Amino acid sequence: MFNEEQFFKDDKLVIGDREFTSRLIVGSGKYKDFEETAKATEASGAEIITVAVRRVNITDPDKPNLLDYIDTSKVMILPNTAGCYTAEEAVLTAKLAREALGHGFVKLEVIGDQKTLYPDMVETLKAAEILVKEGFTVLPYITDDPIMAKKFEDIGCAAVMPLAAPIGSGLGLQNPYNIIFIKEAVNVPVIVDAGIGTASDAAIVMELGVDGVLMNTAIAQAKDPIKMAVAMKYAVKAGRLAYLAGRIPKKMYASASSPIEGMIGR
């Protein structure tokens, strides 16, 4: 009996010392409550959920806590340093997260501009160097610059996370060629982060051969977040499988699907 899961069984996403079956990473912000966050995460099939340490409670047991809703035996909590504008703030936030969660994985964000929420590459690189030296598994949020992506790999980051478009914009992938250049430049996983708007955006990104995609607003702010989470699960799988299958080359003119030999009048 045909089983489509055979195509994904051995196709793991490896980050640092961990393996994941799903290549979709989801965020935890912008949902109406933690219950909806948990339902959407489960529906997406994601095995990693990012959490803004400065905005989402994961430490105070006397307040609503995301950890009460997420099964951490199935889903890894990936803390991020969202809201940090300097390397020093990001390093401190990462250390607090490691103490709270008991692991050193961190999605590193150091924002340089409030309007675009573009990352400050100088401060991000500075923070990454410190965190790598202190034993963290660092996944930096970066611009779609292949030169900078290589620098982050060279200092020991476990993955790079270039943006598709500004955070929360829903614009979809704006510069596919730079993402391809990044994928060619580095040997660590490339996880496209930010700017996804709908399922087709996720599929297009994955068709480029990147290792994963991270999204939050596209699911959390959809009219029906649970349905969109399911759509994204299948979009990421479809894009990955299409990449592995190999698309046909683009041609200027038509190419008939059926042979003309034996046709009447031929």
Curated annotation (Swiss-Prot):
Q: Which GO terms describe its cellular component?
A: cytoplasm
The active site is formed by K107
Keywords, A to Z, come to:
Cytoplasm, Schiff base, Thiamine biosynthesis, Transferase
Q: Which cysteine-cysteine pairs are annotated as disulfide bonds in the entry?
A: none
Q: Is Cytoplasm set as a keyword in this record? A: yes
User: Which GO molecular-function terms appear in the entry?
Assistant: thiazole synthase activity
- Which Pfam family would be a valid example here? ThiG
- Per the annotation, which location comes first and is thus the protein's main one? cytoplasm
InterPro entries for this protein: Aldolase_TIM, Thiazole_synthase_ThiG, ThiG
Q: What is its EC number?
A: 2.8.1.10
Show the catalytic activity.
Answer: [ThiS sulfur-carrier protein]-C-terminal-Gly-aminoethanethioate + 2-iminoacetate + 1-deoxy-D-xylulose 5-phosphate = [ThiS sulfur-carrier protein]-C-terminal Gly-Gly + 2-[(2R,5Z)-2-carboxy-4-methylthiazol-5(2H)-ylidene]ethyl phosphate + 2 H2O + H(+)
Provide the protein's localization: Cytoplasm
Give the record's family classification.
Belongs to the ThiG family.
Protein's job: Catalyzes the rearrangement of 1-deoxy-D-xylulose 5-phosphate (DXP) to produce the thiazole phosphate moiety of thiamine. Sulfur is provided by the thiocarboxylate moiety of the carrier protein ThiS. In vitro, sulfur can be provided by H(2)S.
Official protein name in the record: Thiazole synthase
Q: Which organism is it from?
A: Persephonella marina (strain DSM 14350 / EX-H1)
Name of encoding gene: thiG
